[in-house]
Amino acid sequence: MNSIDLLKKKILYRSEYRGIKEMELLLNSFVKKHINNFSILELKQLDDLLNFDDDNLFKWYLDKKVKIKIPNNKVSKLLKNFKI
């Protein structure tokens, strides 16, 4: 298994087991839809995005005020506009 496959496997796991069911549903659906179309850079951006805690990430997704800075990149824009 190469490093890209390992990163994809890690991302899939981290998107499915979050702690907040709503985030598990949102992130896992998003990842399953996009993961095979992402470049290595986008996969790394997604991996970085998954490092944020669910509470802040969910508030950001719902356009509520958060105390952290979520990166503004292609992956975060796709997630922000993603609907289940």
Predicted segments, located by residue:
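Positively charged, polar, low-complexity stretches
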Residues: 2-43, 47-84
